[in-house]
């Protein structure tokens, strides 16, 4: 039988293009939409970036660090996510202005009131400590923070005395020495033997009793605190200190007591991770070595002196033959201190759900995954996109649970890795958009107003300025375009980011295959190379989605205006989202110029048959000129802000939106990144990753990412992850 390959169907040809060669499709592990909460997360130590954690009793509640306090954000809102899953909320269309009006009228009835009413989730302050938390954890209502006594803390002796003098009262000491068990002995004539000069801090807060306690623990900073509940209201606390010691404390309703001091590793310790059953603990620090401890159930303490534990999956115990009359060699005992290849300083460890595998990450951009049953060599190694660099250093890693089978790893800035743990080969990278440098913008804010008015006297001057942009004056002119309207609650609510002032499409992250991001130093180079490669490849209508929708959620306190809007919305008055449903040329007053972030714009690289996303692009394909620049026409505004290589913009935004559907190449120039110059590097910088975590609640499993713009909650495509499709050729 002869098979004619020329008569293949259209679907077969498309499948062949998408699954072979450079057009291979990578499955999107994340859902097409995510929420961005404008909650500011503080990084109180530049290397410790595990500042966000889900609640142990309610994972929808996110605990995060802000300055001296711990704040709580409740992300459990079924009404908040319901409009996203209704695909008929925004109708696709194929016409121009009429389609936009249709979307505006229908969208206002279906989604306008819901969106404006529900995209507001205020955050709350849980507790404020006397010392800045550098790390923290929460378990069953007990919150513990670690740090040190710093000069910028309220509890610093001089600052504390000043507070007492200003209040004209006698304040109790901000901290007290921790109780030490009699079984602990310290080296004589050592600075560790005098707890009175310890500078490490551990702070406790009990939500049930609303009590707070602060103790000094360790000679230097405590880089990590870990809790394990042994019984009701009885915990084991493990604190990693820069003095090279791991401290184990007994926490109960009576007191906090130091019961054990581990000094096996002779370098500063950064992280201690416990398995879910509490039997195994991995400790790493400023070295490429890490220790794997095993718990003695009789003493409730950990030790490195053990051999082969039957509960780790091996039923055969190792037997050593010792010659008769020979003394046993103590050096033959397994110390369980391992050296990871191609690594330097360890910063985080994480166990999988079954406790059989764990991942440990290092500062040079290496992640080693080990099987606890065979520690000879790592079973897999994950590399950073920027190894041996500051912004590419690995900081935090997390395993997902259930059937998701994913490993998340955060870099120091800008990127989060998503690795398929079924084979450790499928590897994608989430690229977070760069942030605006507010300090740079504020320095030049006073040069903005008079420059806008002088550049719009007549059309001749507009054309002259367009020609001047070609020369050396473009750099000086470009400095005048950076201005941000003032945020109304910036002084009263400093825990709010500027995410509400940035257009949504410039907050959209991208997911790219690891080979496309490897060795790209900046995110601008990643996006620019992606656009260049996509234009050179053979175009086909089915492309993998790499840009994702962002739904901004305000975390500010409710105001009178917000309350009135809620009343109107509840009475049936439509309060439509001006960005999603309006067809006018004016935008909200709090938008900045999108072109200052044009290098961050994601490409329109999505499935053409995705009607929901197509309708979204039709509405958001053009930016709106802000009406708060009085006396400036849209044409002059656009020509002034346009880089010299950018073609003229159409004067009618709605016509441009209609043309963009018929000619994708015309609309993509707004989505192409501008080549980086020294000037652009001054007003934009990479987003700091303040933490990642995995949560699962009634809304599904989600990835939590902390950025400078706020906290992202991104649902995982769990239905797609439940497919174990494979085939063999016989």
Curated annotation (Swiss-Prot):
Chain positions covered by the region annotation Disordered: 82-114, 447-468
Ranges annotated as biased composition (Polar residues): 89-98
Residues with PTM Phosphoserine: 82, 89, 483, 651
Domain of life: Eukaryota
Keyword Phosphoprotein among record annotations: yes
Biased composition (Low complexity): 449-460
InterPro entries linked to this entry: DUF2415, Quino_amine_DH_bsu, WD40/YVTN_repeat-like_dom_sf
Gene3D superfamilies: YVTN repeat-like/Quinoprotein amine dehydrogenase
Keywords carried by this UniProt record: Phosphoprotein
Name the record gives this protein: Uncharacterized protein YLR149C
Species: Saccharomyces cerevisiae (strain ATCC 204508 / S288c)
